[in-house]
Amino acid sequence: MKSVAVMLASALMTAAAMQSASAQAPAAQPAPNPNAPVYVVSYIDAQNALKSQTMTLLKQFRTACAKEDGNQRCEIVQRMEQQNEFAIMEVWKDQAAFKAHAAGPGAQLRDKLKPLLGSPYDERIHTGFAVTAPQAAPSGRIVYAITHIDVIPVPQFFDKAPPLLNAAAADGRKDAGNGRLEILQQIERRTNHFTLIEIWSNKRQLEAHQSLARTIQFREQLQPLIGALYDERLYKILD
């Protein structure tokens, strides 16, 4: 009974902290630098019966997107478990380039995809939080790990997250098999939301990284600061 009471008290304290988030939210972040790169991650959930049509559209979009002015990266990946789910990762040199894309080819893609989807197109716009210069994905049968991290927007939680995230990025890039490890921060009213993107030469290398003591410690230290599941999903390049 005592353990149940302790668990209930802990849950109530966390709920109370989250309820007061609007009153204690971190100070508003400055407007993004219009000349800084814009990082976009979009999640796509196709109807299973329409997966092939979705894949065709996404491949066409990837080819065209890479040729647009200001595009620095356009990658499309397919989830390894639920293969009707996809993610698009784009980097644009500045806000002007992104807005031009969003108003043209980006809007056209959404219109074409809409009848094929099982849930709405989910686009997340970010700034770079812990990133390296945009580069092409390494060759081979690589594995992408994309993780959404939702930090509780209360200073006692939010202020502790950046040092943990920065250290995890710096350490992870040194691990065998890592081709990219970057952390993005959403803009405007969702600055407590982060996206962690990793590329590994194969799944075995990813699993070795996940089993390291410091990786486990990072997740243990981060867990009390987040308000949702540590949502890691594995993908392969759409081919």
Model regions: which residues?
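Positively charged n-region of N-terminal signal peptides that target proteins for export
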Residues: 1-4
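Bacterial N-terminal signal peptides
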Residues: 7-17
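Glycine-rich beta-strand-turn "strand-cap" elements at beta-sheet edges
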Residues: 24-36, 75-85, 109-144, 148-152, ...
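Sec/Tat signal peptide C-region and signal peptidase I cleavage site
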Residues: 19-22
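Short, surface-exposed ligand-recognition loops at beta-strand->loop->(often short) alpha-helix junctions
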Residues: 45-56, 150-161
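Short hydrophobic/aromatic beta-strand micro-patches
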Residues: 43-45, 89-91, 150, 197-199
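An amphipathic, aromatic/His-enriched active-site/gating alpha helix that lines ligand/cofactor pockets
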Residues: 8, 29-34, 60-75, 91-124, ...
